[in-house]
């Protein structure tokens, strides 16, 4: 047996196995798509209107009703003079009232002329303002956003000039149109700025997606984002300023809007005027009824006086017509009686004329008051409608403010979303930068590995050739060992036992076969690994070359896109700078226009307020004058009523006194007549007894026969008593001269005393009436 020599010098087959190349997993570059930014919503048009109106402060004043005091007349004057004085006073009052009415008409004419002048002045101002508006519009025609604002200002100016001719409602409407136009212009400017901002944001987003993580461009984009944030903050501040302006205007409109108390006061005054009109109508009806009653009483008094005159003429007519003194006294008594009655009739007629004049004056005052009440009711309706319009405008302003608040909240929400999107875009940009840097690192490592593999290929070829040479040497050694073993077997005398030798030979063969199989397997494996390594290296080299070419193309494209984006960024910066400058100029011009419009609006509102206050003060003054005239008319009417009541009482008292005097006079005359009848009867009896009566009759017939033939109708025979009618039928016809003279003288004395008493009572009543009038006039003046 041969010892297993050289077994220690063999190289195991595992040493020649091909080691797989350590390949790192390939990381494909992640390219991010463009991230669209959510654009902020556009602003909605919100029409805001002002109210300028204006709560006019009502200044009420009342003047004391001053009435001319009537000086008490002298008690010695007659009733006719007092009636003429009353008529002259009434004529003076009527003349003063006519002068006052003329003065009022002149004032109304002057007010109309001033209103026409104001209208002409306002029209001239409107034309001037229109010319200024045209000049401003022609000077700033190139600014698109400002054009709408100037158009709104033009509309506001025109509406203001038209509204100065109307009431407070037109002023408020014009103010609201101005606000709507200004808000529209501001919204258009904001929309233009937002559109520019959106364009900048789009360019920024495209820039951020294409520049693939350039730090400098990212910083510039961040600066652009900061500028946009500042612009958004500025726009938000402008919106807040507009909201504060709207709130101030709402407060101003709320202060200028007339309250419901004013309408309630107008309603109360109207109700009071209606009540006074009703009272005046009732007083007029009652006065008409009293006048009719007084006329009926005057007619009855005239009839009664006529009857009394007839009775007096019938009773007091003398039997002897040759008495001139008796007729003169009777005629004077009748004349005085008639004068008294005529004075009473003149007084009643004067009172009736005065009453008719006062009734006419009251009717005119009632008509004027009715006209004033209707005009005031119309003004009240106009004011109520204007108040309703102002309430609706305030509601519209509230809705506009709510819309602005909603728009502001939307803008804030859009700004917040934009900030979130910018933050996410920045995060994605950082991720893109990291991915690009990692891809570059991976590419560098793969290139290094490829270079290392390419560098290891010659060493692997050397190792492979060395392994082949080793295999050949091992085969030669094995063949040499086999040859030596055969020689030894041939040279050895006796081989060992066959079993041991065959066993060892079998083991050697098995080992040889195994080694041969291992060598063949290792050779095949080495060849396969070498082929695989070559293929893999070639594929990786081709792939890496493709990746390198693609990266070079992408790098070139990115450089070109970065250059174009740089140009676009410069253009966008210039456009943004121009837009910011234009926006600043527009804001400045808008603020100037707002200040000018605010000043013009305040001036117009102040002018309208002053004019309305003057009109209100004029109407209040006229109303106070009408009230004073009404109070004077009421006072004069009450005085007339009191005078009528006093005259009524005095006439009743006079009639009662006349009735009593007539009754007493009738009773006294009846008693006197009875006494005269008794005396006559006694005298006739004595004359008959003495025989003197027949002689007197003869003498009397001879003396008065011619006069009796002429004056038959004037002789009235006295009634005969029933006692002596049968005894003396002729003697009772003619009384004695002395008895008739005594009875007539007594009767005349009694009548004179009665007339003097009546005249004294009338003078006392007149003095009492004058004292009452003089005491009532200070009370009315106080």
Swiss-Prot record:
Biased composition (Basic and acidic residues): 62-74, 208-218
Keywords in alphabetical order: Coiled coil, Cytoplasm, Developmental protein, Differentiation, Nucleus
Coiled coil: 82-314, 344-437, 498-691
Protein location: Cytoplasm; Nucleus
Cystine bridges: none
GO CC term, one of those recorded: centriole
Keyword Methyltransferase among UniProt keywords: no
Function: May be a regulator of keratinocyte proliferation or differentiation.
InterPro entries (UniProt xref): HCR
Source organism superkingdom: Eukaryota
This protein's name: Coiled-coil alpha-helical rod protein 1
A biological-process GO annotation: cell differentiation
Keyword Coiled coil included in the entry's annotation: yes
UniProt lineage: Eukaryota, Metazoa, Chordata, Craniata, Vertebrata
Pfam families, sorted: HCR
Stretches the record annotates as Disordered: 62-82, 182-218
């Amino acid at each position: 047996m041969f010892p297993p020599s050289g077994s220690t010098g063999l190289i195991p087959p595992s040493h020649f196995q091909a080691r797989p190349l350590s390949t790192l997993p390939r990381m494909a570059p992640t390219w991010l798509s463009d991230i669209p930014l959510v654009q902020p919503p556009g602003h909605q048009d919100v029409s805001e209107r002002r109210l300028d109106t204006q709560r006019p402060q009502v200044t009420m004043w009342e003047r004391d009703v001053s009435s001319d005091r009537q000086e008490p007349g002298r008690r010695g004057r007659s009733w006719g003079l007092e009636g003429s004085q009353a008529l002259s006073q009434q004529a003076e009052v009527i003349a003063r009232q006519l002068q006052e009415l003329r003065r009022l008409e002149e004032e109304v004419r002057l007010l109309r002329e001033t209103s026409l002048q104001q209208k002409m002045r306002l029209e001239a101002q409107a034309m001037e303002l229109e010319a200024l508006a045209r000049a401003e519009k022609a000077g700033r025609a190139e600014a698109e956003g400002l054009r709408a604002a100037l158009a709104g200002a033009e509309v506001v100016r025109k509406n203001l000039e038209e509204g100065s001719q109307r009431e407070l409602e037109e002023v408020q409407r014009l103010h609201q149109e101005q606000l709507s136009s200004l808000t529209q212009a501001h919204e258009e400017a904001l929309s233009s700025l937002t559109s520019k901002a959106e364009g900048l944001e789009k360019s920024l987003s495209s820039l951020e997606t294409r520049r693939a993580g350039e730090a400098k461009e990212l910083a510039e984009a961040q600066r652009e984002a900061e500028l946009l944030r500042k612009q958004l903050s500025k726009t938000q501040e402008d919106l807040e300023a507009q909201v504060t302006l709207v709130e101030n205007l709402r407060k101003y409109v709320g202060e200028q809007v007339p309250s419901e108390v004013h309408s309630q006061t107008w309603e109360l005054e109207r109700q009071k005027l209606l009540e006074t009109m009703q009272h005046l109508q009732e007083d007029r009806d009652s006065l008409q009824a009293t006048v009719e009653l007084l006329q009926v009483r005057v007619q009855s008094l005239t009839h009664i006086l006529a009857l009394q005159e007839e009775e007096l003429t019938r009773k007091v007519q003398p039997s002897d017509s040759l008495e001139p003194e008796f007729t003169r006294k009777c005629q004077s008594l009748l004349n005085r009686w008639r004068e008294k009655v005529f004075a009473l009739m003149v007084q009643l007629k004067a009172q009736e004329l005065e009453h008719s004049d006062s009734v006419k004056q009251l009717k005119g005052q009632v008509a004027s008051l009715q006209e004033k009440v209707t005009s005031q009711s119309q003004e009240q309706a106009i004011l109520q409608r204007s108040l309703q319009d102002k309430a609706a405008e305030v509601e519209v302003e509230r809705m506009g403010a709510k819309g602005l608040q909603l728009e502001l909240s939307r803008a804030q929400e859009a700004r917040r979303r934009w900030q979130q999107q910018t933050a996410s875009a920045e995060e994605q940009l950082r991720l893109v930068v990291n991915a690009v840097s990692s891809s570059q690192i991976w590419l560098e490592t793969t290139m290094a590995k490829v270079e290392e593999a390419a560098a290891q290929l010659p060493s692997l070829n050397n190792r492979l050739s060395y392994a082949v040479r080793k295999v050949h040497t091992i085969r030669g050694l094995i063949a040499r060992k086999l040859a030596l073993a055969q020689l030894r077997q041939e040279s050895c005398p006796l081989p060992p036992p066959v079993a041991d030798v065959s066993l060892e030979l079998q083991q050697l063969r098995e080992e040889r076969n195994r080694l041969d199989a291992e060598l063949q397997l290792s050779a095949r494996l080495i060849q396969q690994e070498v082929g695989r390594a070559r293929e893999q290296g070639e594929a990786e080299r081709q792939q890496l070359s493709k990746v390198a070419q693609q990266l070079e193309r992408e790098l070139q494209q990115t450089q070109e896109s970065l250059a174009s984006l740089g140009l676009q960024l410069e253009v966008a910066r210039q456009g943004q700078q121009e837009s910011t400058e234009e926006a600043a100029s527009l804001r400045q011009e808008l603020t100037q226009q707002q200040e000018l419009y605010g000043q013009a609006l305040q001036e117009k509102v102040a002018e309208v307020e002053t004019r309305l206050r003057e009109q209100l003060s004029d109407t209040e003054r006229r109303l106070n004058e009408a009230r004073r005239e009404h109070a004077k008319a009421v006072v004069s009417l009450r005085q007339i009523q009191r005078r009528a009541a006093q005259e009524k009482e005095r006439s009743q008292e006079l009639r009662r006194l006349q009735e009593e005097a007539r009754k007493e006079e009738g009773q006294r005359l009846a008693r006197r007549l009875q006494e005269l009848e008794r005396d006559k009867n006694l005298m006739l009896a004595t004359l008959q007894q003495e025989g003197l009566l027949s002689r007197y009759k003869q003498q009397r017939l001879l003396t008065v026969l011619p006069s009796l033939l002429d004056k038959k109708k004037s002789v009235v025979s006295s009634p005969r008593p029933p006692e002596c009618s049968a005894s003396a039928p002729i003697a009772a016809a003619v009384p004695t001269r002395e008895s008739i003279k005594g009875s007539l003288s007594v009767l005349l004395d009694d009548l004179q005393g009665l007339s003097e008493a009546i005249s004294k009572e009338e003078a006392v009543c007149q003095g009492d009436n004058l004292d009452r009038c003089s005491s009532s006039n200070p009370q009315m003046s106080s």
